[in-house]
């Protein structure tokens, strides 16, 4: 019995010892592959009315106004709309209205009209070539719009041929001015 137990232990020892001695050689060119992610988030930009034009129509005398109808060319600046919302937006519209043109004593320039001659200096918007806006209007008048644009542009409008017209009239001297209200609407609605 002693012999069989010893031989079993010897066989087990050789078998177990054999497993501990075995090792495997490393491969010369191992291949391993894992994936990771590269990502970024692009936020939509904004639709913004960046700059609007002031209009200066110079000086006249009371005699000039009393004797003849007037057409005065202004010295405006650039008007600018930036649209960086991307191509899937509904478009936009730029309109304006003009208050009564009055002096410091609240005397109104009668029948004044702002004749906006708009050209696109840069961008992809559509402009209304000539628009007449009566002083004292309450509803804005469309001057430029964008529908189906890229949504990736700054749009500049040149208003250098804009005029102010009014008929001859009896008038007081003084500085006359009105408020031009620009309205940028975040939607396009054909008129």
Please describe what each predicted stretch is:
Residues 24-122, 148-191:
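N-terminal small/polar-rich segments of proteins
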């Amino acid at each position: 019995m002693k012999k069989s137990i010893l031989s079993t232990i010897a066989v087990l020892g050789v078998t177990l010892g054999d497993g501990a001695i075995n090792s495997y050689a490393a491969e010369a060119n191992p291949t391993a592959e894992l994936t990771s992610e590269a990502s970024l988030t692009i936020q939509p930009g904004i639709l913004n009315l960046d700059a609007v034009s002031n209009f200066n129509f110079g000086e006249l005398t009371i005699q000039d106004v009393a004797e003849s109808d007037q057409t005065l060319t202004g010295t405006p600046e650039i008007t600018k709309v930036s649209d960086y919302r991307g191509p899937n937006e509904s478009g936009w519209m730029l309109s304006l209205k003009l208050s009564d043109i009055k002096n410091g004593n609240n005397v109104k320039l009668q029948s004044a009209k702002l004749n906006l001659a708009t050209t696109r200096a840069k961008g992809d918007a559509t402009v209304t070539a000539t628009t007449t806006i009566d002083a004292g209007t309450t509803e804005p008048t469309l001057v430029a719009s964008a529908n189906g644009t890229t949504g990736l542009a700054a749009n500049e409008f040149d208003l250098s041929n804009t005029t102010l017209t009014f008929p001859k009239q009896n008038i007081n001297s003084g500085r006359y001015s009105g408020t031009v209200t620009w309205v940028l609407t975040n939607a396009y609605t054909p008129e």
